[in-house]
């Protein structure tokens, strides 16, 4: 089912984005 893999990849993508934003925030503070 392609929808399941899409949402799984999307949540992984969001986690990566959040992690990168967090690293940027740590550097800036």
From Swiss-Prot:
GO cellular component: extracellular region
Matching Gene3D superfamilies: 6.10.250.590
Keyword Mitochondrion: no
Subcellular location: Secreted
Induction notes from the record: Produced in the A cells of the islets of Langerhans in response to a drop in blood sugar concentration.
Keyword field contains Lipid metabolism: no
GO biological process, one term: response to starvation
InterPro entries: Glucagon, Glucagon_GIP_secretin_VIP
MF-aspect GO terms: glucagon receptor binding; hormone activity
A Pfam family it matches: Hormone_2
Protein keywords: Hormone, Secreted
Role according to the record: Promotes hydrolysis of glycogen and lipids, and raises the blood sugar level.
Record-linked PANTHER family: GLUCAGON, PRO-GLUCAGON
Record family assignment: Belongs to the glucagon family.
Protein name: Glucagon
Organism per entry: Platichthys flesus
Gene name, Swiss-Prot/TrEMBL: gcg
């Amino acid at each position: 089912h392609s929808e399941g893999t899409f949402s799984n990849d999307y949540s992984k993508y969001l986690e990566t984005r959040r992690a990168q934003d967090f690293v940027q925030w740590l550097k800036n503070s």
